[in-house]
């Protein structure tokens, strides 16, 4: 089934009569991407039951690529297409694209921006990115982690279009306490 639960929905006008009677074209990450997996898990409730998918029952299928610029080019050349990729790439290409608000778990329509991502209101399409560290090497990476959790680290994160955790957030504090606990126990 498509994401509206109806296998026969293929036109924008079938979702809303004010939309054109043109094929719904979808573009995004390829199936090897974490973005693809995350988006599918977040948006398709029946995905694991063999229900909703990206391309099932679509005449034009699903245009996918490991290269975000391929998706942007597809969206630019297909005005009735919709696509998805990470916020960082949207920020880099926002002069060519429009980001659509989504209805979050509170029922509000929220557009993606640094504030709504940081405060968690842009859900279910917000996810954390992790730094994984082997505890045996914590002494060697501690200074890097101090930098990553500093204001300078936040500047780097912002400069590439990602949204840093706020130093006052409980998630940031909890994460830093875990780093300190490992250092103190090593």
Where are these regions (language model features)?
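Flexible loop/hinge segments at secondary-structure junctions
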Residues: 1-186
């Amino acid at each position: 089934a498509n994401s509206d639960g109806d296998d026969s929905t293929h036109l924008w006008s079938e979702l809303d009569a004010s939309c054109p009677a043109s094929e719904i074209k979808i573009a995004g990450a390829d199936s090897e991407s974490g973005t693809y997996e995350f988006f599918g898990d977040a948006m398709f409730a029946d995905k694991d039951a063999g229900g909703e998918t990206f391309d099932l029952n679509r005449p034009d299928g699903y245009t996918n690529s490991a290269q975000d610029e391929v998706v942007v080019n597809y969206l630019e050349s297909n005005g009735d297409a919709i696509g998805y990729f990470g916020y960082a790439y949207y920020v880099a290409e926002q002069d060519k694209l429009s980001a659509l608000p989504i209805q979050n778990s509170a029922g509000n329509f929220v557009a993606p921006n640094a504030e709504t991502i940081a405060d968690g209101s842009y859900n279910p399409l917000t996810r954390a990115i992790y730094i994984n560290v082997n505890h045996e090497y914590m002494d060697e990476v501690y200074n890097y982690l101090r930098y990553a959790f500093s204001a300078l680290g936040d500047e780097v994160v912002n400069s590439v279009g990602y949204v840093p955790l706020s130093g006052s957030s409980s998630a940031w504090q909890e994460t830093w306490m875990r780093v300190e606990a490992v250092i103190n126990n090593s």
